[in-house]
Amino acid sequence: MKKKYRIKKNDDFQKVFRRGKSFANRQFVVYTLKQEEASHFRIGLSVSKKIGNAVCRNRIKRYIRQSFHELESQINPENEYIIIARKPAANMDFHEVKKSLIHVLKVGRVLKQKPNNSK
């Protein structure tokens, strides 16, 4: 995922926190805010120092970024997302992180449904 698609500035984080909607599961909290003129979604990541050491926190962030990269075609491009990792995320592998993110994005109804062509 390109760096221009990441949320880095505190003002941008605060805007999404204040105006956006949130939804959560045990591992992640996701805030989302609709941006009308955006051509691509942006994501911001937050992993507290209470969660593991730096290696563990960076691994979680890599897993989240890669999950969003793989789900890119299903994610609404007009939104900004902030993902906050909770403690249970520290013990998860990539596939568990991706599955948990899919679940929380479906809860928030921001994930497009795949067309069902199994007939």
Curated annotation (Swiss-Prot):
Keywords on record: Endonuclease, Hydrolase, Nuclease, RNA-binding, tRNA processing
Class of the enzyme per the UniProt entry, highest EC level: hydrolase
This protein's record includes keyword Nucleotide-binding: no
UniProt record, GO biological process: tRNA 5'-leader removal
A single GO cellular-component term on record: ribonuclease P complex
Reactions mediated catalytically: Endonucleolytic cleavage of RNA, removing 5'-extranucleotides from tRNA precursor
EC number: 3.1.26.5
InterPro entries named in the record: Ribosomal_Su5_D2-typ_SF, Ribsml_uS5_D2-typ_fold_subgr, RNase_P, RNase_P_CS
Top-rank lineage group of the source organism: Bacteria
GO molecular function, one term: ribonuclease P activity
HAMAP family: RNase_P
NCBIfam families noted in UniProt: rnpA (TIGR00188)
Family to which the UniProt record says this protein belongs: Belongs to the RnpA family.
The protein's role, per its UniProt record: RNaseP catalyzes the removal of the 5'-leader sequence from pre-tRNA to produce the mature 5'-terminus. It can also cleave other RNA substrates such as 4.5S RNA. The protein component plays an auxiliary but essential role in vivo by binding to the 5'-leader sequence and broadening the substrate specificity of the ribozyme.
Quaternary organization: Consists of a catalytic RNA component (M1 or rnpB) and a protein subunit.
PANTHER family reported in the protein's UniProt record: RIBONUCLEASE P PROTEIN COMPONENT
Name of protein: Ribonuclease P protein component
Organism expressing this protein natively: Listeria innocua serovar 6a (strain ATCC BAA-680 / CLIP 11262)
UniProt gene name: rnpA
